[in-house]
């Protein structure tokens, strides 16, 4: 990311607005605001924000910095990810000096919105009478009730060629956008849904945005793979994603422990059993990028203090 873009983000992102998304701030006088620190347990507010200087500081745990470092710390993001998050927040187009270009802010938002709406569509379909019953029965056979399915956003992809495509095109998305988002693919007579007659799990990046899906076949007559994932897209990079991480990140950082299990239902079962540090890979082997992501959650004062359990 170009230095002038970083400088622009740092100086135009109001730190009190950004912090205010996580902390209830109150005026503290002298141009400062204060609230309960999000980085340690406390009953009296010792977390201060100075909007005029763009800095925050906690007098309890001695953490502090600017708006970028705040997002890095609270969302467990890298520097680049934090800058990109803030750029998205203010709809600012970043430029890059070298390396692969990132999907433009407006394009990225369209892809994220398409996936968000797709997740809601699939969730609604799971509750419909008829063909979705096989999906509900599968979940019940694994010990998951309606509340569990809702907690993890599990859905059902209808056994139709273009049910999702029609739904999203009715909301203004184009065939090109839906294919780029990994939701449809080119068929013999136009674009068709990528997932059909499958149980679907939304896959989130660490920030919580839905970036793709994992889908399990429900019919023995389905000759496709047992599990099918969103293909690589501008927002879905399977080597850098862990299923359940957006739910587990706070507990992982707090307990200095992460439990890596095999699949989506294993993550569900673990969390419902109280093991809230469980995550799983998304149809790929556990690799270096996954380790890099988890190290950020398990680091304490630049030292690795935690355990990874398989």
For the regions a language model picked out, list residue spans one by one.
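Terminal amphipathic helices with adjacent charged low-complexity linkers/tails
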Residues: 95, 103-104, 149-150, 154-156
């Amino acid at each position: 990311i170009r230095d002038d873009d970083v400088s622009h983000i740092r100086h135009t992102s109001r730190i009190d607005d950004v912090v205010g998304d996580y902390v209830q701030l109150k005026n503290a006088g002298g141009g400062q605001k204060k609230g309960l620190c999000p980085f340690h347990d406390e009953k009296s507010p010792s977390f201060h924000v100075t909007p005029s200087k763009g800095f925050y500081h906690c007098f309890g745990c001695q953490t502090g910095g600017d708006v970028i470092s705040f997002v890095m710390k609270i969302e467990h993001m890298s520097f680049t990810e934090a800058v990109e998050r803030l750029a998205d927040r203010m709809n600012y187009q970043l430029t890059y000096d070298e390396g692969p270009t990132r999907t433009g802010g407006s394009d990225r938002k369209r892809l994220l919105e398409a996936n968000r709406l797709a997740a809601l569509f699939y969730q609604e379909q799971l509750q419909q009478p008829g063909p979705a019953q096989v999906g509900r029965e599968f979940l019940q056979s694994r010990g998951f009730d309606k509340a569990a399915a809702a907690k993890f956003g599990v859905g059902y992809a209808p056994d139709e060629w273009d049910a999702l495509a029609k739904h999203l095109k009715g909301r203004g998305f184009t065939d090109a956008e839906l294919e780029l988002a990994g939701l449809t693919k080119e068929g013999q007579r136009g674009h068709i849904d990528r997932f059909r007659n499958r149980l679907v799990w939304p896959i989130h990046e660490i920030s919580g945005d839905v970036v793709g899906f994992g889908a399990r076949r429900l019919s023995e007559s389905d000759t496709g793979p047992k599990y099918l994932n969103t293909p690589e897209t501008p927002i879905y990079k399977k080597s850098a994603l862990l299923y359940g991480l957006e739910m587990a990140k706070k507990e992982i950082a707090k307990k200095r422990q992460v439990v890596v299990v095999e699949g989506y239902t294993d993550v569900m079962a673990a969390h419902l059993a109280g093991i809230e540090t469980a995550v799983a890979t998304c149809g790929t082997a556990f690799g270096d990028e996954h380790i890099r992501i988890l190290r950020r959650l398990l680091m304490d004062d630049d030292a690795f203090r935690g355990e990874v359990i398989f």
